[in-house]
Regions:
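Hydrophobic alpha-helical segments
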Residues: 1-177
Length: 177
C-alpha cells in the first residue's frame, strides 16, 4: 500500500492528518533530519502504532533506502521502548518513590549497541516514547539527543512524525465507524 492509499483510508474528518502525512515524511517537512533518519523514525513509529496497514506502508516506502541494520534498529526501538516505557512510566507515576531506587533488572543492551548511529537510534526511541506516553523516557532521550548534538528542530521533527503516524492509526481505526 502506498502513502496515497493509506491516506484514502482516512475519513474526510481527518483532512489535517492527510495533509500532514503528505509532508512529514519529506526532508522539507521534517527539518534538520536526513532521509534515513526520517525513514527510521517513521518505521519505529509505525511499529509502535501496531497498525498492520501503517507498518506495511511505511516499510514499503523506506525499504528502498534504509539498510537492513536501520530497519532492524527501528524494530528494536519499538520493542525495547514497549518495555521501558511501561516500566519507567510506572517509576515516574507511582507515589512510592522508593521504587526509583530499585534496580530495574531488565536487559536493555540494544540501547548501548543498536547496530546503527546512536543519535539515529535515540531519535527512533524518542518517537516511540512519545507515542507510548512515557515522560521520563521522553526526557531521557531528549537529553541524550541534545548531548549528541541534535537540534531542537530535529527533535521536534521526530515528535511530529510520531504524532502524525499515531493520529493516522487512530483515524484508520475509527474511520469506518
Amino acid at each position: 500500500m502506498s502513502i496515497e492509499q493509506l491516506k484514502s483510508k482516512l475519513s474526510e474528518g481527518a483532512k489535517d492528518i492527510k495533509l500532514n502525512l503528505s509532508t512529514i515524511l519529506t526532508e522539507e517537512g521534517a527539518p534538520d533530519l536526513m532521509k534515513n533518519q526520517i525513514g527510521g523514525i517513521a518505521l519505529a513509529s509505525a511499529y509502535a502504532t501496531r497498525n498492520p496497514g501503517i507498518i506495511d506502508t511505511i516499510l514499503s516506502e523506506v525499504s528502498s533506502y534504509l539498510t537492513k541494520p536501520e530497519i532492524n534498529a527501528a524494530k528494536s526501538a519499538a520493542t525495547i521502548m514497549a518495555m521501558n516505557n511501561i516500566y519507567y512510566r510506572f517509576i515516574h507515576l507511582v507515589s512510592d518513590k522508593s521504587f526509583s531506587t530499585m534496580p530495574a533488572k531488565l536487559r536493555m543492551n540494544v540501547i548501548g549497541n543498536p547496530g546503527i548511529d546512536k543519535l539515529n537510534f535515540e531519535l527512533n526511541c524518542l518517537a516511540v516514547s512519545v507515542i507510548n506516553g512515557c515522560g521520563m523516557c521522553i526526557d531521557a532521550h531528549t537529553q541524550e539527543l541534545t548531548k549528541a548534538g541534535a537540534s531542537k528542530l530535529a527533535i521536534q521533527s521526530s515528535v511530529r512524525i510520531a504524532a502524525v503516524l499515531n493520529a493516522t492509526a487512530i483515524g484508520i481505526e475509527i474511520g469506518g465507524q
